[in-house]
């Protein structure tokens, strides 16, 4: 079996999505297409995240990572839409036979997008599912004394309710920082 054909969706230049793409590429997986959401809410989320990690290094921009691929003779389509749930996305991905869609830090996405790829849609969630759902999972983990971690799961029309593929907890101790 070869490597899956997949589309990668992220909020425009969000550090989480940039790092996730860097990690995916480092493992030898290259998306067929990248679809960035350029929206005011996405901008707000990106700025909040950057403030949280202020001063720490972030992965190269999407354009830089794509240029590095292009220098190796690998071209990846990069489209920008105003919202991933929009009518704009389905025509873009229906042009490509996809095995998977990978969410790299998106807002909640529902509907036809979830049903299109042959093998499903995968999300990396910053919390241990099913105990800690939603975008502020690390904070809720601390507040409710739930271990901090990450979950990779298939997506369905619920919020962080799809089949769990992998859970990994990260021990966190008083005084630790993002570094």
Put a short name on every predicted segment.
Residues 1-179:
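One-carbon transfer enzymes
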